[in-house]
Amino acid sequence: MTRVLDHGFVRLVDHMPQQDLDASIVQAARVSYGDGTKSTRGDRGLIRYLLRHWHTTPFEMVEFKFHIKMPIYIARQHLRHRTASVNELSARYSVVPKEYYDPTLFRGQSVVNHQGSEGIVEVNGVETTQALEQAFGVYEQLLEQGVCREQARGVLPQSTYTEFYWKINLHNLMHYLQLRLDHHAQQEIREYAEVIYNLIEPLVPITMQAFLDFRVNGIFLTGPEIETIRTGRNVESPGEQREFEEKKKILGI
């Protein structure tokens, strides 16, 4: 179990197959030729070819099951990846433990990315903690008064921790990681994504190296961006031009 934030965690519960996960990807890819696993170098080359050319089915043969605990408002982002199987704690059936995410620092609203953040904002942390404590106090009071759990939960803040089992195949997990490891993703979910990556990397080291090379550290150029490189003209859309400038910095052009 790896701790995340103040009360959260990620635990790798199980994986399929139990061993030689990289090799199982190769075996699935070669089944039509009747070949088993060849040399490690051959396996590495094939895995990199599959990932580079978006041959995704062999990666779906590997699955991981996690037990994850995170704040509700972070879980809402995490569970947007609908290709996973999920079973979550129910506040209708269970009394919610008094655990909430209480950040020590508050980030400012980004002036460029309207859904992002930047810098640090000075706030009265005592007041935010008091608000969270009050919400849980009201929740507990409602339960003591006999209010049903399915209604009493309505006063709980989004920073309340939830937990769930999450099963996903490697192909879809790489898509999740590509999005959630990106620097544009919210900091809190990036921390969870980093932990998930670190848990699976020793199990599929060849695949994860290819994933870093071709997905995380690779750059995709759009048609307008390629035309801009050829002609020297700016991309028409201001938003697309801004994204292109970021890519140019990475490329050093």
Predicted regions and their residues:
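Family-specific signature for flavin-dependent thymidylate synthase
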Residues: 1-253
